[in-house]
Amino acid sequence: MVRRVASTDALQVRFWGTRGSTCASGPQYVEFGSHTPCVEVRCGERLFIFDAGSGLAALGAELGPTAPDKIDILLSHLHLDHISGLPFFKPALLGRERVIRTYCGNLEGESAMEPLNRLFAPPLFPVRLSQLPARFEHHGFHAGEPLIFDDGMRVETHLLNHPGGATGFRIGHRGRSVCYISDVEHSDLWPDPGLADFVHGTDLMIFDGMFSASEYAYCRGWGHSTWQKGVELAQGADVKSLAIFHLYPGHDDASLKASEAEMQAIMPTAFIARERQVVAFEPADREVAPARLEPALAQAGEH
């Protein structure tokens, strides 16, 4: 099998969990995966992790003892499907010098540190944060403020329409960018002007397309959207490619492939995210096309 390998300075995305609300299980869910949200983003060698759902455990197993000494995990919000992988993140159990930094918007005025401490405590979990070999640091912010890291990296943030609030993120590297827009419900005025401005021109938008258009009629107000609204936003904001994400756990491979075909007839650069799929963009100052693994090459185990 021949495929393009991204350079060491590419902006690279890898999906470790693509489901929403709960995991999916069974042979009919193999192609698109079973885990809840977790996305690895590499800016060259610099690692960022978006959300810490059950897919974080698989990412942690892959990183193992080679994980960086500092790991930044950006949480869109604290609903359980976005943090359930934290207690099982292998790098937190290895290496006493490692620092794991979590970032979450103070969406309802409360720091995320208190809920995370409740998660890492009996009766929910037998080990407290303070007892882990790695050291956890939490950084709160208000959605809309940029996050600026000690190495100069910068991540923009945006408040999303979701019960209790959620944060969208935009990260750039060498003229390329990715927007992570998980857990958002479209508004009556759509595309939302503020969100359209936030994602405008990005190379890849990862978007909450949990429900079909027919399902949404029964799920209005739950805080999620559809692939159709993702396409409308992408096309209205000059987004170059679209990954539909936060997939409903009841949608099996056959139904998702049918939806993907329908979507690609409207927007050929859109696709439904698959677990362990890799999308890479070379620096914009190079004459190299975006290196994306086609879905057939992005099955579980490919890396």
Would you name each region that the model predicts?
Residues 1-179, 190, 195, 253-299:
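Binuclear metal-dependent hydrolase catalytic cores
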Residues 50, 76, 181-182, 207-209, ...:
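Active-site flanking residues adjacent to catalytic metal/cofactor-binding acidic residues
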Residues 187-276:
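Cap/insert and terminal regions of metallo-dependent hydrolase folds
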Residues 302-303:
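ATP-dependent carboxylate-amine ligase
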